[in-house]
Amino acid sequence: MKQLHVQKYLEKVRSRKQHFLYPLLFKEYIYAFAHDYGLNGSIFYEPTEILGNDNKSSSVLVKRLIIRMYQQNYLINSTNHSNQNRFLGHNNYFYSRFFSQMISESFAVIMEILFSLRLVSSSEKKEIPQFHNLRSIHSIFPFLEDKLSHLNSISDILIPHPIHLEILVQILQCRIQDVPSLHLLRFFLHEYHNWNSLITSKKSIYVFSKENKRLFRLLYNFYVFECEFVFVFLRKQSSYLQLTSFGTFLERIHFYGKIEHLLVVYRNFFNKTLWFFTDPFMHYVRYQGKAILASKGTHLFMKKWKCYLVNFWQYYFHFWSQPHRIHINQLSNYSFHFLGYLSSLLRNPLVVRNQMLENSYLIDTVMTKFDTIXPVDPLIGSLSKAKFXTLLGHPISKPIWTDLSDCDIIDRFGRICRXLSHYYSGSSKKRTLYRIKYILRFSCARTLARXHKSTVRTFMQRLGSVLLEEFFTEEEQVLSLIFPKTTPFSLHGSHRERIWYLDIIRINDLVNH
């Protein structure tokens, strides 16, 4: 009966399937729109530059591609001769990869448009208010600060990957009725699997090392959406238990299930027994492939949810999810990494003196505070990968930037430093940011000295405060005016308050290394 109820729930939500406009792939303006829709020339300009042509020739390649797509047997030729790298009947390896990338990117853009229109139309019908401030990544941390201080347990979840490519097609099959589009998607995934082992270091095909990002990002988002879709259903089913009266719930579950073993239900244990069986309210936060599940329940309750998730991924997506990808810990003694921050709960014991008439009492209490700091080792590791410092944190020069002008070098280092300071403005300890600023500042000085074949001391004496101003963020300038005692150029004089900004829509590249 319960299985039937779950099936009806899934069919009810998925009943509104979206028709896919397959003929759009034969329209030239779709490829032009795909190029302007955020590709930044990744599939049109880079290949033509390698071929020695100008950028206008991309329209010629699009027309050539559409003509080949109209051929009756292009998919058959491509499938039967996949070992020869033939695509759309073309023997040239470069054009085969290039045409495939053009179609896959346009395919992804069309799906994005259709599902975006569907989302907008549904939100207009429901009159859902749009809160643009909540688009910021930093808006997650005030939510965690408000909720986690009252919770006990947390599950650190890594969403399983990779999954079988056919599962991605089946996920879209629930929402797309156009069969040719699904066959085309299967064809792309099959070709990508073959090409993935054929990429070499040749300059002519180097551009394909970052191909099809839009398509696979879209498929991954649909996969995550499917996971969260069923998770919300399980959450709704568990929340129903909270609406059940305590007495009825105890009678149905506890009394009849344990009547053979319990002779008397003690009144003192009544609340504890009810708390064990009721389903505490849970909080779920996710970014990219990492999610956090926090609850006020017991460790046994979190283990039940872990079992639910593992079985769900196993039976719903038909692949085994390693249980060790879900870590259950107590919030009181656990620190977790999320969105580049190291977060934890700080417990500060306090003694409060209470005076009542002639009697006084000392009350011991504990204040819980959600704390976020910028981790030192991951940031230095990211700077090391980007060739700004060594693994020990010693600044080094950036040889690839020595051909730039002095203004460009200083501007690049300054923008990186300001972006990191802006992103980690919510850190309660600024010492890590001071160290990162120090590394970037002296890496900039070493790069300038290397470009002019001089010493670092010479440039530091010549530029002085001018170089330091480039690493001085706007918020620090404003706060230096508000708090005059803070010296503008003192590394240890900056503010210690945490600030969350509402204009950060993506994680910093150095944070995401």
UniProtKB/Swiss-Prot annotation:
GO terms of biological process kind: mRNA processing; RNA splicing; tRNA processing
Location relative to the cell: Plastid, Chloroplast
GO molecular function: RNA binding
Chief location category: plastid
Keyword Amino-acid biosynthesis carried by entry: no
Keywords: Chloroplast, mRNA processing, Plastid, RNA-binding, tRNA processing
Annotated GO CC locations: chloroplast
Function, as annotated: Usually encoded in the trnK tRNA gene intron. Probably assists in splicing its own and other chloroplast group II introns.
HAMAP family: MatK (MF_01390)
PANTHER family, per database record: MATURASE K
Protein family membership: Belongs to the intron maturase 2 family. MatK subfamily.
Name recorded for this polypeptide: Maturase K
Species per Swiss-Prot/TrEMBL record: Typha latifolia (Bulrush)
